[in-house]
């Protein structure tokens, strides 16, 4: 054991070096806290968030961080393809209410950080323009809009009681 897992400066620099290298001008971070999070202690998660924001600002990137709870699952599915499918549902104006709420919260922060006024991401989800914009982004990167997400051969529904 190297005892680096809880070293906030190392965690922050690892995450932020990748984000800054992408060349973005603004960045919104969703730092999770709670029983399902990497940083379960809210105070430590806050410290990580503040450290990453400062690193971003020092590099000339408009950076903000939200510390959000991860004590309960977000959305209705688990697994990469299922979670991507759920995210696409949100872009199409549907999806689970908690995912929609977090999406709008993060998008509003990004719009504000970018200095854009008069735009509400909730409207973009409702009128389909969020999905249209996402499709243009996929096409601009040479992605396949018709790519199929993998489907598991087995399915198990687990209902909370």
Question: Could you say what each language-model-derived stretch is?
Answer:
Residues 2-161:
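Well-ordered secondary-structure scaffolds
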């Amino acid at each position: 054991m190297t005892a680096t897992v809880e070293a906030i400066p190392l965690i922050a620099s690892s995450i932020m070096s990748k984000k800054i290298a992408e060349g973005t001008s603004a960045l919104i971070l969703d730092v999770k806290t709670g029983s399902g999070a990497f940083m379960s202690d809210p105070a430590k998660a806050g410290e990580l968030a503040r450290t990453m924001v400062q690193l971003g600002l020092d590099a000339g990137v408009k950076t903000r961080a939200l510390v959000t709870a991860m004590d309960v699952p977000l959305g209705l599915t688990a697994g990469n393809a299922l979670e991507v499918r759920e995210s696409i549902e949100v872009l199409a104006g549907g999806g689970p209410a908690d995912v929609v709420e977090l999406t709008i919260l993060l998008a509003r922060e990004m719009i504000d950080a970018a200095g854009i006024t008069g735009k509400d991401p909730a409207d973009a989800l409702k009128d389909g323009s969020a999905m249209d914009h996402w499709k243009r982004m996929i096409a601009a990167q040479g992605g396949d809009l018709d790519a199929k997400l993998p489907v598991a051969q087995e399915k198990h529904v687990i209902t909370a009681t």
